[in-house]
């Protein structure tokens, strides 16, 4: 295989969700597995809905995932290239002017459906006489431009779906240019894919019906169409769709929870494939395992509980250096991290344990007489991981308590929690003075 060139082409009209992230990830894994290039293209020709803050969010999300790109392009900077391609198509007769209003097209569609006919555009505009066109333009109508499809079967060998085909006669001629002169998705996308040398278009299966017109458009512009891979769309755990505008499963929300990016990459890379879902620590590992023949056509479901399990496994082996920046806790050190790490389900939970160790807490006193007696037996001097065992043995001998009756009241008084990290690691972090005050029932 020659080195592939792929592209991820989001529109900056909303936040990326995990479905978008999966498409971006699989594009990059495929390209890098074969020594190729990954292009990030922002499809921002919709000036009304595209927003710079969404564009920045896309870049931030991809950086967070580690999906660095080899080239960044913005369609809003390439309008001249699209206009030149449109002019070529007009000269060759492959696009034609249409003057129907949206209301007229909708009425025509309803009539077709009422007659049991497919709602395919009937090319009425091609039958307009010059005087009719002049009259419509005198009324102030400005044409939109449709691409004239060849009424033939279009075939391609899809990397995921296998041999695929669609007949041009089953589709309306797609509108390439709006009445205001702005471009819809199809023409800019094909022009960019040609000029950037894209060899493989990897995207969701909601684009399958776009493929036949796009293949014909590649050919009309004198180019060989790239290969296509259409992935089943990712859904939520119960089968609901994901929406970037609603923020459903948005990467922004996931990042805020402290999720490790490789937990998400490990999950998204394997969803819909025959590989078992398991932790991978680097993108290079995922690249080495990537192959199209592992992917099927079943609907993959994104389960946040599965993501959390992967994240917890990664977190429980992560060094302090790996999490320092993500912790966001001033003063936190390796001793603290190693103490709390085994008991965390989410990285954000570490902040609460930092507060327990370093900030004032109202103790929960189950048996004041017992905890005061235990306070009197706290050892002096430097504390380490052996202190807890030595101290509780002394308390046991002095009070006769053992098991839960011994340990539970001490944990409640020292941490205010029923459960948590081992107290042999927490006690040195809490310190002598704070521990004694809490055992005495004082806020400390």
UniProtKB/Swiss-Prot annotation:
<dbReference type="InterPro" id="IPR001412">
    <property type="entry name" value="aa-tRNA-synth_I_CS"/>
</dbReference>
<dbReference type="InterPro" id="IPR014729">
    <property type="entry name" value="Rossmann-like_a/b/a_fold"/>
</dbReference>
<dbReference type="GO" id="GO:0004818">
    <property type="term" value="F:glutamate-tRNA ligase activity"/>
</dbReference>
<keyword id="KW-0067">ATP-binding</keyword>
<protein>
    <recommendedName>
        <fullName>Glutamate--tRNA ligase 1</fullName>
        <ecNumber>6.1.1.17</ecNumber>
    </recommendedName>
</protein>
<keyword id="KW-0547">Nucleotide-binding</keyword>
<keyword id="KW-0963">Cytoplasm</keyword>
<dbReference type="InterPro" id="IPR008925">
    <property type="entry name" value="aa_tRNA-synth_I_cd-bd_sf"/>
</dbReference>
<dbReference type="Pfam" id="PF19269">
    <property type="entry name" value="Anticodon_2"/>
</dbReference>
<feature type="short sequence motif" description="'HIGH' region">
    <location>
        <begin position="10"/>
        <end position="20"/>
    </location>
</feature>
<keyword id="KW-0030">Aminoacyl-tRNA synthetase</keyword>
<dbReference type="GO" id="GO:0005524">
    <property type="term" value="F:ATP binding"/>
</dbReference>
<dbReference type="InterPro" id="IPR020751">
    <property type="entry name" value="aa-tRNA-synth_I_codon-bd_sub2"/>
</dbReference>
<dbReference type="GO" id="GO:0006424">
    <property type="term" value="P:glutamyl-tRNA aminoacylation"/>
</dbReference>
<dbReference type="InterPro" id="IPR049940">
    <property type="entry name" value="GluQ/Sye"/>
</dbReference>
<feature type="short sequence motif" description="'KMSKS' region">
    <location>
        <begin position="241"/>
        <end position="245"/>
    </location>
</feature>
<dbReference type="InterPro" id="IPR045462">
    <property type="entry name" value="aa-tRNA-synth_I_cd-bd"/>
</dbReference>
<dbReference type="GO" id="GO:0000049">
    <property type="term" value="F:tRNA binding"/>
</dbReference>
<feature type="binding site">
    <location>
        <position position="244"/>
    </location>
    <ligand>
        <name>ATP</name>
    </ligand>
</feature>
<keyword id="KW-0648">Protein biosynthesis</keyword>
<dbReference type="GO" id="GO:0005737">
    <property type="term" value="C:cytoplasm"/>
</dbReference>
<dbReference type="InterPro" id="IPR004527">
    <property type="entry name" value="Glu-tRNA-ligase_bac/mito"/>
</dbReference>
<comment type="function">
    <text>Catalyzes the attachment of glutamate to tRNA(Glu) in a two-step reaction: glutamate is first activated by ATP to form Glu-AMP and then transferred to the acceptor end of tRNA(Glu).</text>
</comment>
<dbReference type="InterPro" id="IPR000924">
    <property type="entry name" value="Glu/Gln-tRNA-synth"/>
</dbReference>
<dbReference type="InterPro" id="IPR020058">
    <property type="entry name" value="Glu/Gln-tRNA-synth_Ib_cat-dom"/>
</dbReference>
<dbReference type="Pfam" id="PF00749">
    <property type="entry name" value="tRNA-synt_1c"/>
</dbReference>
<comment type="similarity">
    <text>Belongs to the class-I aminoacyl-tRNA synthetase family. Glutamate--tRNA ligase type 1 subfamily.</text>
</comment>
<keyword id="KW-0436">Ligase</keyword>
<comment type="subunit">
    <text>Monomer.</text>
</comment>
């Amino acid at each position: 295989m020659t080195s592939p060139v792929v592209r991820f082409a989001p529109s900056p009209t909303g936040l990326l969700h995990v479905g978008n992230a999966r498409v971006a990830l699989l594009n990059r894994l495929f390209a890098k597995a074969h020594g190729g290039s990954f292009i990030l293209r922002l499809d921002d020709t919709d000036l009304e809905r595209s927003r710079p803050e969404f564009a920045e969010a896309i870049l931030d999300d991809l950086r967070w995932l580690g999906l660095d790109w080899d080239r960044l392009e913005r369609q809003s900077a390439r309008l001249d290239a699209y206009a030149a391609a449109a002019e070529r198509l007009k000269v060759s007769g492959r696009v034609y002017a249409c003057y129907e209003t949206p209301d007229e097209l909708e009425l025509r569609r309803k009539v077709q459906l009422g007659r049991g006919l497919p709602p395919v555009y009937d090319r009425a505009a091609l039958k307009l006489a010059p005087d009719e066109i002049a009259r419509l333009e005198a009324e102030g109508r400005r044409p939109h431009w449709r691409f004239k499809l060849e009424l033939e079967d279009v075939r391609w060998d899809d990397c995921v779906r296998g041999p695929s085909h669609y007949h041009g006669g089953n589709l309306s001629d797609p509108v390439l240019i709006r009445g205001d002169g702005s471009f819809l998705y199809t023409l800019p996308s094909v022009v960019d894919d040609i000029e950037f040398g894209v060899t493989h278009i990897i995207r969701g299966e909601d684009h399958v019906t776009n493929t036949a017109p796009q293949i014909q458009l590649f050919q009309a512009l004198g180019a060989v169409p790239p290969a296509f891979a259409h992935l089943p769309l990712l859904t939520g755990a119960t089968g609901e769709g994901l929406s970037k505008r609603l923020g459903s499963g948005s990467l922004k929300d996931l990042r805020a929870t402290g999720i490790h990016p490789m937990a998400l990459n490990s999950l998204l890379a394997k969803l819909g494939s025959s590989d078992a879902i398991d932790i991978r620590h680097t993108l290079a590992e995922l690249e080495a395992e990537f192959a199209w023949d592992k992917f099927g056509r079943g609907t993959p479901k994104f389960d946040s509980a599965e993501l959390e399990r992967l994240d917890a496994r990664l977190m429980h082996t992560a060094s302090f250096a790996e999490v320092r920046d993500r912790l966001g806790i001033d003063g936190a050190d390796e001793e603290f991290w190693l103490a709390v790490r085994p008991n965390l389900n989410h990285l954000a939970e570490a902040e609460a344990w930092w507060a327990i160790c370093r900030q004032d807490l109202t103790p929960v006193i189950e048996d004041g007489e017992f905890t005061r007696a235990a306070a009197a037996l706290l050892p002096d001097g430097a504390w380490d991981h052996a202190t807890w065992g030595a101290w509780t043995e002394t308390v046991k001998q002095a009070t006769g308590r053992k098991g839960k009756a011994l340990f539970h009241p001490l944990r409640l008084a020292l941490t205010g929690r029923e459960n948590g990290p081992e107290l042999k690691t927490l006690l040195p972090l809490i310190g002598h003075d704070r521990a004694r005050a809490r055992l005495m029932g004082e806020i400390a």
